[in-house]
């Protein structure tokens, strides 16, 4: 998710390169995160004013457009916001356009041609200004500013305390869709976070299909339930709070598939993460322990009892060496339980995923 490594020599499975629409979403994500790290020096977070006390906690893009603003006031805000963008960070001008696009709605035309033209905003200008300052000065991720991430064919609600879904993780959903008979199976999404994977998989399922999504974080469970209800898949997705397999005792041995994008960053690497990630995204969703493998190994331990015979699993990893280690580990320790275990490339040609089948 966050590391870069050398192009692997071999791969068992090559994912297709991003399609044009997916490439646009990938660019939006990259311009919202990694490019900021490269172009804008960190600024102490103490410089930014707090949000207004009465600020609405609802994600910006889900709020009603209840704040009429005249042309002149909006233009003045745009000038002030643009003036904060340093010459080294031109991508922030795109973020400003996206912020105003997410915050705006068409205003009804007035019957009086002399009436001033109004813009309908989803937040008052003082709140938008505070949100913008937090993004520019505090390096707060743009996705947290607007409250969403464009992911696959979804607009996923996100907020502080929930990991922002990455474009490469979309491949997990594609791999689920390639499993024979997946539509009618029961699936587990462990460490669901925003619920993006669970919702995307649920939208592909047939009448008998179901997703059990778990997370230990109360905030993640709340946001995942919001996304499940927004997309109307509450009859397909059951969100359960708890750690990994613990909430799934009643479906043990009945799962067609287990999916997880767990924390896999080595603890010593956390201080070196770009500020957008290290300062703001939840450590709970990032820290994989000394070698980044703590949670991945725990998931491997629970797989054989969770999956039905022939069941499928796919985990996201930190890439290359971590994936290769997991493949060797599973094939050595559980050779009698699993087959067709292999590393899978992401669209950057990194061995990002490990997948396989229960015998």
Residue spans of the language-model regions?
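Residue-level signal for inorganic ion chemistry
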Residues: 99, 139, 169, 197, ...
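N-terminal chloroplast transit peptides
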Residues: 1-27
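Helix-to-beta-strand junctions that scaffold the AdoMet/dcAdoMet cofactor pocket
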Residues: 206, 281, 307-309
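Mobile active-site "lid"/loop adjacent to the S-adenosyl-L-methionine
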Residues: 262-295
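Conserved AdoMet
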Residues: 59, 94-179
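N-terminal mitochondrial targeting presequences
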Residues: 2-4, 24-63
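Conserved Class I SAM-dependent methyltransferase catalytic core
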Residues: 290-358
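Conserved SAM/SAH cofactor-binding pocket of Class I
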Residues: 168-272
């Amino acid at each position: 998710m966050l590391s870069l490594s050398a192009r692997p020599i071999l791969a068992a499975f090559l994912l297709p390169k991003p399609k044009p629409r997916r490439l646009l979403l990938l660019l939006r994500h990259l311009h919202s995160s990694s490019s900021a790290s490269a172009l804008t020096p960190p600024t102490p977070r103490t410089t930014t004013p707090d949000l207004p006390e009465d600020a609405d906690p609802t994600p910006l893009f889900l709020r009603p457009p209840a704040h009429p603003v005249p042309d002149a006031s909006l233009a003045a805000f745009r000038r002030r916001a643009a003036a904060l963008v340093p010459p080294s960070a031109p991508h922030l001008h795109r973020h400003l356009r996206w912020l105003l696009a997410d915050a705006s709605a068409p205003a009804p035309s007035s019957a009086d041609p002399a009436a001033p033209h109004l813009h309908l905003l989803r937040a008052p200008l003082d709140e938008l200004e505070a949100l913008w300052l937090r993004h520019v000065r505090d390096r707060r991720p743009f996705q947290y500013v607007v409250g969403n991430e464009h992911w696959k064919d979804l607009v996923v609600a996100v907020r502080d305390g929930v990991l922002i879904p990455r474009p490469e993780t979309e491949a997990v959903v594609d791999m689920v869709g390639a499993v024979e008979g997946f539509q009618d199976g029961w699936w587990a999404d462990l460490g669901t976070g925003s619920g993006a994977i669970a919702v995307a998989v649920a939208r592909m399922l047939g009448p008998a299909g179901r997703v059990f999504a778990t997370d230990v974080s109360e905030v993640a469970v709340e946001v995942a339930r919001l996304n499940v209800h927004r997309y109307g898949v509450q009859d397909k997705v059951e969100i359960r709070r708890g750690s990994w397999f613990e909430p799934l005792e009643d479906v043990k041995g009945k799962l067609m598939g287990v999916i997880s994008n767990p924390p896999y960053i080595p603890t010593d690497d956390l201080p070196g993460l770009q500020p957008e990630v290290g300062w703001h995204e939840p450590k709970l969703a990032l820290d994989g322990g000394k070698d980044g493998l703590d949670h991945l190994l725990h998931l491997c331990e629970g797989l054989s009892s969770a999956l039905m015979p022939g069941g499928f699993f796919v985990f996201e990893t930190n890439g290359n060496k971590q994936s290769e280690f997991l493949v060797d580990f599973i094939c050595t320790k559980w050779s009698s339980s699993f087959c067709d275990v292999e590393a899978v490339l992401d669209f950057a040609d990194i061995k990002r995923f490990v997948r396989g089948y229960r015998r």
